[in-house]
Amino acid sequence: MENQPKLNSSKEVIAFLAQRFPQCFSTEGEARPLKIGIFQDLVARMQGEENGLSKTQLRSALRLYTSSWRYLHGVKLGAERVDLDGNACGVLDEQHVEHARQQLEEAKARVQAQRDARKREAAENGEKREPRRPRPAGKKPTARRDGEQGSKEVRKPRAAKATSERKPRAKSETTEQRSTPVTSLEQLHLGQTVKVSAGKHAMEASVLEITKDGVRVQLSNGLAMIVRTEHLQF
């Protein structure tokens, strides 16, 4: 027989036995109850074969196979045991069936207990994490808003300052314009806009005529009059 690859786990050994003895072992569906003393039959049948399997590996694989839920489900009243070739080797007795039923119930109870323990642990961890959830909502949004408000408050004085700086400039320009007197008739021409000073106030006027005695102007209100150059401004 050809050399078999080395089998490292009990599951691999079971897969090998199912391939070597398909009428006795299986990897899917309900397993058939095994003949009492099947271990000795395996050792005798496989003696001399270069399969690399030890007695310890065979015993561990059989223990795993016969304790699986799939195998225990197959141990029931009326079922027959089989040998390596699938031949019937006697009907299961009630004592063996009851023992298998108890093993199956205990196995299911252990699995359920493990599931319940995981659920409790997950629930406890969830409760411990719950107080931390509100923290993201309390991160620094308020601080950022305060910062924005603070920046706005800083900008307002700047705008006021800029406005206050611009106003004196406008006044100075106006003052300069009002304080420019007409010193010579040569500075004037017909239709030119000038200002006529009357006390502390000045009124806009348009030049109508220029004579040696004075300048005839028309005020914005329609009144025409003759004024001297010292009463005119640009």
Curated annotation (Swiss-Prot):
Residues 177-186 have a biased composition (Polar residues). Residues 104-130, 143-156, 163-176 have a biased composition (Basic and acidic residues). One of its GO terms (cellular component) is cytosol. Keywords: Chaperone, Cytoplasm, RNA-binding. GO terms for molecular function: RNA strand annealing activity; RNA strand-exchange activity. GO terms for biological process: post-transcriptional regulation of gene expression. It holds the Pfam family ProQ. PANTHER family: RNA CHAPERONE PROQ. RNA chaperone with significant RNA binding, RNA strand exchange and RNA duplexing activities. May regulate ProP activity through an RNA-based, post-transcriptional mechanism. This is RNA chaperone ProQ. It comes from Edwardsiella ictaluri (strain 93-146).
